[in-house]
Amino acid sequence: MSTDSQAPKALRGVGNFIDDRFHLAKTGEKNLRKVFPNHWSFMLGEIALYSFIILLITGVFLTLWFKPSMQEIVYDGPYERLNGVLMSEAYASTLHIDFGVRGGFLVRQIHHWAALIFVASLVVHMLRVFFTGAFRKPREINWLIGVGIFTLAMLEGLFGYSLPDDLPSGMGVRILQGVMLALPLVGTYVSMFLFGGEFPGEDIISRLYMLHILLLPGILLALIVAHFMILWHQKHTQYPGTGRTNKKVVGTPMFPGFAVKAGGFFFFVFAVTVGLSAFVQINPIHLFGPFTPTSITSGLQPDWYMGFMEGSLRIFPNWLDFQIFGYAVPIGVLVPGLVVPGLIFGGLGAWPFIERWITGDHRAHNVADRPRNAPVRTGVGVAGIVFYGLLWLAGSNDILSHTFSISLYWTTYFFRVAVIVGPIIGFVVAKRICLGLQRRDRETLEHGYESGTIQQLPSGEFIEVHKESSAETVHVLESKEEVDRIDAETISSVEAATDANGVEAPAARGLKGRLRAKLAHWYTKDNVSFEGVEAHTGHHLHHGAAEEKEPAQAH
């Protein structure tokens, strides 16, 4: 029997034809052997990618029947409860998708759920990158691309949410227009340009539709491709462990291991999305009715990722508004609607460079930090989460007041204080927890772990025997990088910032240098040092008992 496993002659001919022109054989072989680390948190980015693919597929389906027009018609369709109601063609076509197209309601639900999962997975993925320091050199550009993807994803979701022209989406567009009007000097012109006249105008749906299906998806697709190309070139970060270094990645090769896992995970994400869409209804526009400028309702909430902006608008005081030369400057809308999101996204994008400037760390990092080993960074991240979460809850202050029978004014006052105090408390608590975990790690590295075995010494004292940690655990604990702490005395002393001739160090000159020194001290002053700590080994297991036996024998 022949054991020849060569491909058929026709396929070999095609393969040789392509390889002779593009030389893909060696490149393909190398890429197929590329190693990906094995850890569940690295699949969070995969969820975002797969959700985006689902969005593209379902979005193409929906565009076949959706009509982006604000032309008013009298509805006469399959949803009988709204027959005879005046509505836009956009809303009527959405009702047709839900009730007139077979499977249309399910596809629209899948599209909406995929959008929510897409943004959620982006958030969790970015949190993983932030807390592990995976944004550091050489990945600053990829971090900026990720922030751009996150920002555009929120805008894309907002515009898509506004297309059906039902009551909640119309209210969202009205809030958007109010934020645009808050722009000093140019706000009115920007609003008129986008809406084609006074609100609601006749062009906003068609213009948002163009942005939603063409411009923003194209930019998102380009950024996602760039993100993965950079990731492929720079290699993946990995958590500390045996054999894992800045130059060596330990994991599963691209083919067949990772490819099979990724393919199966895509179908899992798709199945979960379809399951949610089939059994958990979301955004039932047929129950809300068409939007009219004179209509409003209570209890409605935007998609979760826009809740922080609504909360910011609700709790920000309006007594800060003022006028300049007769022009109103509505601080109560301008700051929560534009400044707060700008600070959030701007802070995210700038953080890698801020941290590098403070610490002076210009090294390349391919091994991720444990969050506990960067207590200030972790504290800042927790403070940001608390700030975002409180704003998100503030967007439901009316529902909270109604549910718990609390005055709306009191919930508003509470959130005004909480968004300032809460992040500070979150930072302090998270930092102290990280420092406590560092001390426990140092003790585990030096003395081993508690075995649960109690031993009595000759003196009558009882101790718990510690056992040697595994090699993997020791490697993880020893992966903590030593951070040089800057003493407060060093900063406050003029002599410490000068050389032997009394010349001030260039880095310490001026306000900028002194500010950096203060921040560096704050960033590193409490870090627990592992310097000089040796891993616990077997011959140290009973050192406490041995020390007690020697004086007993002397007697």
Label every model-predicted segment:
Residues 318-337:
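Short linear, low-complexity motifs centered on an aromatic residue
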Residues 1-315, 335-555:
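Membrane-embedded alpha-helical bundles that constitute the cytochrome b-like, heme-associated redox core
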